[in-house]
């Protein structure tokens, strides 16, 4: 299998599991194409044409040596150390979950997904976009000085394929959890925690002292309407959004991780927050993707935080 095929599979699975729905994703792509067509010649040369077919700016082929992928090393975070490990293990391809290179530099662009998901939960789209605007700009500025291409340069020197797949995997996790939690019909926050711990990735994370936790609320707190708004969408959104979520009638948020300022804002808005866990949630989405690759005959080795669980 060539690297482009792995990339295409990731995008396809990401779109199919996108909480916004396939029609909304296709609409976003159509709008992107229309904007591109209106650009002048110079702007078109600067435009990232992958955005015409890939709605996830944090997912990209970073180095392709044009040789088939047969043995893959996959990890949540990939650096030069993991690239050298891949060389030692004779892997021809490395899959990073967290974005690298130009995918990291443009991470903030995928955060617009959050506003569209919030709108589906009842937060007016104009309010969601307005609240997130400043946070998206903040993330963009924060990422700007990072040495984005450090690991990509290592991949080139070692001549090992490198790809990062972020939001598609997070979409898979969010979609899985959305269906799972709806089926469980929890009435209290404690019941959400119990349900999450029945999922193998979270069950193993408990043993690593990194299992699901209540950040706001208590086990006895009623859940109200549940929103999975903080599993996918690039990175942590705006802390001001919790007040708007409460006004939209939401009672509980399930997320991967939560900063202290965000926690305080959720508490002030009386929104329960369940943090499922970062590496465990990443592992859930990655596993659903890796299962597909394994079913297609690729050999897989996991490292760097992945709790590997095979489902099919």
What are these regions (language model features)?
Residues 1-93, 99-267, 271-312:
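Non-catalytic interface/targeting segments
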């Amino acid at each position: 299998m060539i690297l482009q095929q792995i990339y295409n599979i990731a995008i396809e699975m990401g779109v199919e599991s996108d909480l916004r729905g396939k029609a909304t994703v296709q609409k976003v792509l159509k709008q992107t194409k229309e904007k591109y067509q209106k650009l002048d010649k110079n702007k078109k040369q600067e435009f990232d044409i992958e955005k015409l077919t890939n709605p996830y700016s944090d997912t990209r082929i970073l180095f392709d040596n044009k040789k088939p992928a047969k043995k893959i090393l996959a990890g949540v975070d990939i650096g030069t150390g993991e690239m050298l490990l891949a060389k030692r293990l004779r892997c021809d391809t490395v899959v990073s979950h967290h974005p690298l290179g130009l995918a990291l530099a443009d991470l903030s662009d995928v955060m617009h997904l959050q506003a569209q998901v919030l709108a589906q939960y009842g937060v007016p789209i104009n309010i969601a976009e307005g609240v997130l605007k400043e946070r998206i700009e903040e993330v963009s500025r924060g990422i700007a000085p990072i040495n984005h291409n450090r690991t990509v340069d290592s991949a080139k020197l070692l001549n090992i394929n490198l790809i990062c797949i972020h939001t598609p995997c997070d979409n898979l996790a969010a979609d899985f959890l959305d269906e799972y939690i709806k089926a469980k019909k929890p009435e209290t926050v404690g019941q959400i925690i119990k349900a999450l711990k029945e999922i193998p990735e979270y069950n193993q994370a408990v043993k690593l002292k990194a299992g699901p936790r209540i950040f706001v609320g208590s086990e006895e707190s009623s859940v109200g309407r549940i929103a999975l708004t903080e599993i996918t969408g690039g990175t942590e959104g705006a802390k001001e959004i919790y007040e708007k979520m409460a006004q939209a009638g939401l009672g509980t948020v399930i997320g991967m991780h939560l900063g202290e300022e965000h926690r305080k804002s959720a508490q002030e808005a009386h929104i329960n927050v369940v943090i499922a866990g970062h590496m465990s949630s990443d592992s859930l989405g990655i596993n659903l993707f890796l299962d597909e690759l394994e079913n297609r005959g690729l050999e897989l080795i996991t490292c760097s935080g992945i709790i590997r669980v095979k489902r099919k």
